[in-house]
């Protein structure tokens, strides 16, 4: 897992989303060779998870409460929202790879989001 600073909707029908990963990231090949991914949107009170997933720690899920989605991707408990995605297509984007996934399932709750704005996380 990793922390990303941008995530976007691509299409409503089919439901497609995207994010990008720098090709130098240690987990780059894991994501590139996977059948998809989960996006877990953090709440305002989950700044610690943002820091954890941006760290070099290998087993980031070790002390977390999480379940596998129907597609086999990790869904972290108590997040604002999650999207379970299967690989639609991946595109070259210079020093990044753009990962487009088809949303197979999702969920959300009414909580305040964790935001990154003006070079600050809050």
What are these regions (language model features)?
Residues 1-122:
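Basic, polyanion-binding surface patches
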